[in-house]
Design a protein with these regions (language model features):
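Glycine-rich, charge-decorated loop segments at or immediately adjacent to ligand/cofactor-binding or catalytic sites
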Residues: 95-101, 173-188
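Bacterial Sec-dependent N-terminal signal peptides
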Residues: 1-30
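Short internal beta-strands
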Residues: 83-92
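Glycine-rich oxoanion-binding loops at beta->alpha junctions
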Residues: 105-137, 149
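A short helix->loop->beta-strand "cap" motif at the edges of active sites that frequently abuts
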Residues: 82, 167-171
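N-terminal phosphate-binding or glycine-rich loops at protein starts, especially the Walker A/P-loop
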Residues: 33-82
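Glycine/threonine-rich flexible loop motifs
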Residues: 146-158
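Short acidic catalytic loops
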Residues: 138-147, 173-176
Length: 188
């Protein structure tokens, strides 16, 4: 009798554990309830008022509204009359059009006229911000979708941005986005 009870208890524990550990891969509407940080400007706009803003962004830095579709975070902040001063672009560039490992030059964004500082150019560690580029910045925003794999440079870029922010005593807002590959974790 005792052996049967232990077997039943063990089976129940294994089933419960497997429900927790193994992901539920079916698609449901709950995923549409995720609201990314960029879509919640109203929650942090008081931190941006009367500040010169630097934005670390790329083509994934978008806001979605059912009535307007996709709008880039930079365009949205400018439309709301925030003082976006500079854009810092990671590997693949601000618009995401550059190939892997390309040395990208600084440029001017055609749409906004803002200076884009390449964080993946010559004479710099990939993702590193030069202190001189932060002289006219009061606050930094980081909004880049990561894909949850180790070899992507975006998480390293965030690391360097955090270091530069701390070194220059500049507040940093990190706008979170869900990891699209979060259901599967593997490796050493």
């Amino acid at each position: 009798m005792f052996k049967i009870q232990n077997s039943v208890l063990f089976t129940i524990l294994v089933l419960n554990f497997s429900l927790i550990v193994y992901p539920n891969n079916k698609t449901n509407d709950d995923k549409s309830n995720v609201i990314v940080g960029a879509n919640q400007i109203s929650k942090y706009e008081n931190l941006l008022q009367d500040k010169r803003i630097g934005i670390v962004a790329n083509h994934t830095s978008v806001i979605f509204r059912k009535d307007l579709g996709y709008t880039h975070l930079v365009d949205s902040l400018i439309k709301l009359d925030f003082d976006v001063t500079k854009i810092f672009a990671p590997e693949h560039g601000f618009r995401g059009t550059e190939p892997n490992g390309a040395n990208i030059d600084d440029e001017i964004d055609i749409k906004t006229g803002l200076k884009i500082i390449s964080l993946h150019g010559t004479n710099r560690k990939y993702g590193e911000i030069d202190d001189g580029d932060l002289k006219d910045i009061d606050i930094l925003i980081f909004d880049i979708q990561d894909v949850g794999v180790r070899f992507y440079t975006h998480i390293s870029t965030l690391h360097y941005v955090m270091e530069a922010s701390a070194r220059n005593d500049i507040p940093l807002i990190i706008l979170d986005r869900p990891n699209p590959n979060a259901h599967y974790v593997d490796g050493p």
